[in-house]
Amino acid sequence: AGTPSTVSADALPTAQINGIVWDQVVVGDIVYAVGKFSAVRPAGSPAGQNESPRSNAMAYNINTGEILNWAPTTNGTINAIAASADGQTLYLGGEFTTLNNQTAWRVGAVRASDGQRAPLGAAANGSVKALSVSPDGQTLYIGGAFTQINSSARQRVAALNLGSQQLTNFAPKIDNYYVRSIVEAVDGSAVAIGGAFESVGGSDKPGHGIAIFEKDGSLRKNNASSVVRGAGAEASVMSVKADEHGLYAASYSRLGTFEGVMRLNWVTGDIDYMADCHGDSYDVLPAGDVVYAASHSHDC
């Protein structure tokens, strides 16, 4: 079949920041980046020069590197960002309690056009680390280390109907640590989470670092964590993604069994393949015939 074509490694002009970016999303030719930083500067500018103030969120043109005026503000780190299906709204999650100087308990929404606040009926009592919009655009999944959303019990994962702005009945019980990533199957049949959690509702096979749920929140009993077991204080599934071929996961581990990229079957949880390279893996992206990974892999 030959080698599939990939994007090049050619450098593009990219805006710089004075801190760290934890997540980003691309809408059209605009990159929206969030994390913990207070200033942004043009590509090529040394640190401290030509800086413009930002408060943990910024945007730039992916082709030219031009910094845009989009500049929502928060009083704490933003860990996650997701775009609505139409690209007009951006959802933010993190450690903050204010968004654009108004109360926002660790999750909120802003307009992609100007960064002004948009309505979102959600508030979390603990850190939000993951956000994901369903393929049909109707549901926002929220993951992290919280135990309540809108004063209703939700153990580290929840789902919000974006039409009604109400919580759905999706309420798995993640027993400890946190949820780091969430994705819904492309056909809408199931939801997967990855993180540092060691069990789900008392089950660790499946339920250790990665788990697949029915749409009603019940745990799909399969082999998802029978082979790869990385969770707890020093291991985590950092990213889960989906396409028509399966469920992809990337992990890091100091004490677990795997720190590469793998693809699983949504129904059985069986592993289709594992890229068993040593070196922590932080993100994975299936793109047609190619799967990209962000890692410091070695010894492949």
Language-model features, listed with the residues they occupy:
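Extracytoplasmic surface signature
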Residues: A1-C300
